[in-house]
Structure formats: structure tokens, C-alpha cells
């Protein structure tokens, strides 16, 4: 484990780069996530592991055969959300197509329901691999079914209703 906190967060300086070459994993802490009370405040777009390919077999055997595929789909949605969020910030949500709005809604679920933790809650402190797989499948099942419903003429507003609006 190597921990580096360079001045100004500039990880391009030599000590940080040497550490990254040795540990081959980077968890990018994000002040914006912390300000939004999203913990752990690890940025999923800047963080990486060079061990992912080596661990694929382990996850296939110990979590689910399709674990890496599920992970890849979630990461793709989060990356697309980042691109779409730039458009929303410039011209507003109304400029997005229904499928793009669905991507944003699904990504919100990934962030808030899957990646967000409350370390003080006994249930939320730790999640087993089995539960993680079920959560990933549930989020992606929602996305696939909602995409199908959109193709059949469903209203995006109804597909994106949060439970707080229903009760």
C-alpha cells in the first residue's frame, strides 16, 4: 500500500508517479464527492487497478461468472453519465433524449444505491460479494427493462419516478 498526498493534488510529480508504478492501484479521492456527502469519496472515473484482469477469474469463481461483465456495464454507464452531465450543465436536461435521460437515472442509481455507503450503519458498512452481484443485476435489469419500455412508447418521466414521489 502506498499513500501519497502531493501539494495541490498534483499526482504528476515524481514521488506520486513512482508510487503508482509500484502499487499499480489508484484511488482518487474527490473533494466534490465529499462535499456532496457521498462516501467513500473515491472517484470511479479517475481510480483504477492494473490487477483487474488478473482478478477476473477469482471474481468469476467467488462472486459470479458474469461479475466482470456486470462491472464493465456499470462503468460504461458511469462514463457516459459524465459526458451527458456536461451537456446538461451547458444546455439543461430538456436537451437530452429519453434514452440519455434513462442513462442518467440509471447512473444515479449506481452512485446512490450501489456505490454510496454509510459507515455508521451496521447494514451498510459491509456488503457481501453475493449481495453486490444481486444489486448490479437489479440495476442493470431496471435499465434494460426501461430501455425496452421506452422503445415501446413509455413516458420517460414515469420510468424515472423515484419512490418518494409515489408515496
Regions found by a protein language model. Give the residues of each.
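P-loop NTPase catalytic core
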Residues: 1-165
Amino acid at each position: 500500500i502506498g499513500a501519497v498526498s502531493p501539494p495541490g493534488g498534483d499526482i504528476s510529480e515524481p514521488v506520486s508517479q513512482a508510487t503508482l508504478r509500484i502499487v499499480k492501484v489508484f484511488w482518487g479521492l474527490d473533494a466534490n464527492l465529499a462535499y456532496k456527502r457521498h462516501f467513500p469519496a473515491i472517484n470511479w472515473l479517475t481510480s483504477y487497478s492494473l490487477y483487474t484482469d488478473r482478478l477476473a477469474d477469482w471474481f468469476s469463481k467467488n462472486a459470479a461468472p458474469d461479475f466482470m461483465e456486470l462491472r464493465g456495464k456499470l462503468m460504461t454507464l458511469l462514463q457516459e453519465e459524465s459526458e451527458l452531465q456536461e451537456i446538461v450543465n451547458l444546455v439543461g436536461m430538456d436537451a437530452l433524449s429519453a434514452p440519455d435521460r434513462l442513462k442518467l437515472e440509471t447512473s444515479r442509481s449506481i452512485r446512490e444505491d450501489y456505490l454510496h455507503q454509510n459507515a455508521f450503519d451496521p447494514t451498510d458498512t459491509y456488503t457481501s460479494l453475493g449481495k453486490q452481484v444481486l444489486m448490479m443485476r437489479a440495476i442493470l435489469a431496471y435499465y434494460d427493462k426501461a430501455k425496452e419500455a421506452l422503445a415501446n412508447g413509455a413516458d420517460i418521466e414515469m420510468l424515472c419516478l423515484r419512490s418518494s414521489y409515489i408515496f
